[in-house]
Design a protein with these regions (language model features):
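Hydrophobic, aromatic-rich transmembrane alpha-helices
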Residues: 104-116, 164, 168, 409-429
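Hydrophobic/aromatic-rich transmembrane helices and adjacent perimembrane loops
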Residues: 151-152, 455-466
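Short hydrophobic alpha-helices at membrane interfaces in multi-pass membrane enzymes
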Residues: 3-19, 48-61, 120-132
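Transmembrane-embedded, aromatic-rich helix segments that form part
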Residues: 27-39, 72-75, 147-153
Length: 466
């Protein structure tokens, strides 16, 4: 199928399904690395490890283009048009968004037409760059920096796609009309799939009883899509649960240090029916800045401090803290304790345990908080279970006879590992299939970055309260 004429239509179908999946769950984007590997192995019979790594890097760029580019970019550029037409030209609400949608559709159609006919390489490049710009892909970040980054990216892309430059570079690095046409069609399908979010605006406009964030315009839709109601969590760098807010002395008073995350636009309430529609700018989300920070903070919530200590024997280390001119010592977890909690709770208890329930066995279906008698994974093999959770024969009858109790003696796990290694070392095609499945299911390392962007998914797994 991959070598047949018009086989690119399957790639375009995948792009459409990707656009639809954005409206379901952004973690669906993590299928793209596996799909790119399938494409690479189909197109390259003598695939190499180097080529596989390059394909994976390309897939990461693809994921980033959708996650950091198209998803927030459409809302961002649409917001610029909305401000121009409503605040600048005095038109009604959503008029700028309507114009933006029309221009985006026209640019996509023009780009597909130019890349299909190949009549003029300059027009083909211009239509492609215009489409990318209207999608907001180059405008990464917030505020003026996003505009500067966008201009630089557009300029670099324009220089690279210039017909004179394309004629001089090596053939393998040229962007062919077919590649550009396929890219534009895929982008069009992603946008069509992504447009399923229009239902959110339509539903909110009807003022239904459940109307969270009330996303009735492009700006409130942006807040809804970024899940601002769920707040933020430190991912790569931030405070620990015992960190103190940084203090500044101003006019003889201690003032907590705060940072403002941009600004937002909201509809202005009319004082009379004759007043024109307009948006007003309000301060964005205000967050406290902390004096003690660490890399990859897993134990960050001050309200869960006692529960953290149930999982890790926290000794910590003392860090000096300027409390308005008075130096005091603050004890925060060290990096090893932080990583230990990550492995013992977030990976082992909240990830590996669920996995082993299905491939080794389950003790019972009682919600556990780390106790040896509630909800652990077991094998059914006594000497292994004794090492993991103690002698199961000593449990009371109500736990032994729990309906959630299942033991598989690790047979599914053993059979899976046998199949995995057989597939990996059976042939070249087998090792290719192995890596495809590996990257399709091994998405845990990518969960945290994607979850932080969506702000709705599980970022730092919440601790049980019981």
């Amino acid at each position: 199928v991959a070598d047949q004429p018009h086989s690119d239509r399957w790639i375009i179908l995948i792009a459409y399904l990707t656009g639809l999946s954005i409206g379901v769950h952004l973690l669906n984007l993590l299928c793209l690395p596996a799909i790119v590997l399938v494409y690479y192995y189909k197109k390259t019979p003598n695939a190499t490890a180097k080529g596989s790594l390059i394909a994976l890097l390309g897939s990461m760029v693809l994921v980033a283009a959708v996650l950091y580019g198209i998803v927030p970019g459409i809302v961002k550029v649409g917001g610029w048009f909305e401000l121009l037409f409503v605040n600048g030209l005095g038109m009604s609400f959503n008029s700028g968004v309507v114009v933006y949608i029309i221009l985006l559709a026209a640019a996509l159609i023009w780009g597909v037409y130019e890349s299909y006919t190949e009549k003029n390489k300059a027009r083909m490049a211009i239509s492609f760059i215009l489409t990318i710009a209207l999608l907001g892909i180059p405008f990464y970040g917030h505020g003026a920096s996003s505009i500067i980054i966008g201009i630089l990216v557009i300029a670099a892309l324009g220089l690279y796609l210039a017909p004179s430059v394309q004629a001089k570079i090596k053939e393998r690095w040229r962007i062919t009309a077919r590649t550009m046409n396929t890219a534009l069609l895929c982008t069009m399908m992603i946008v069509i799939g992504y447009s399923s979010y229009a239902l959110i605006v339509i539903r909110s406009t009807a003022n239904t009883p459940m109307d969270q964030n009330s996303p009735e315009d492009i700006f409130t839709l942006g807040e809804y899509l970024s899940r601002e109601q769920y707040g933020t969590r430190p991912l790569f760098y931030g405070p620990a649960f015992s960190s103190k807010v940084a203090l500044d002395v101003k006019d003889g008073y201690c003032i907590p240090r705060q940072s403002e995350a941009g600004s937002k636009f909201v509809r202005k309430e009319k004082t009379s029916p004759d007043e024109k529609d307009s948006y007003i700018e309000l301060p964005g989300r205000v967050e406290y800045e902390y004096a003690q920070n660490m890399f990859f903070p897993r134990m960050y919530s001050s309200s869960h401090a006692p529960l953290y200590k149930q999982w890790v024997d926290i000794k910590g280390h003392d860090v000096p803290y300027d409390q308005c001119g008075e130096m005091v010592m603050v004890n925060i977890p060290n990096q090893w304790e932080n990583i230990k909690f990550f492995f013992s709770y977030q990976l082992n208890f909240m990830y590996w345990r669920y996995f082993m329930w299905n491939f080794a066995g389950r003790q019972n279906d009682i919600q556990g908080s780390g106790e040896i008698e509630h909800g652990n994974w077991i094998t059914g093999i006594p000497f292994i279970d004794n090492l993991l959770v103690g002698n199961q024969e000593l449990l009371p009858q109500d736990l032994k006879n729990n309906k959630g109790h299942n033991v598989f003696y690790c047979l599914p796990l053993i059979l899976g590992l046998i199949g995995l290694f057989w597939q990996a070392y059976h042939s070249q095609r087998g090792i290719q299939q192995f890596w495809v499945v590996f990257f399709l299911f091994l998405t845990k390392p990518l969960h945290n970055p994607v979850n932080e962007i969506t702000r709705m998914l599980v970022r730092s797994t919440p601790l049980p309260s019981g």
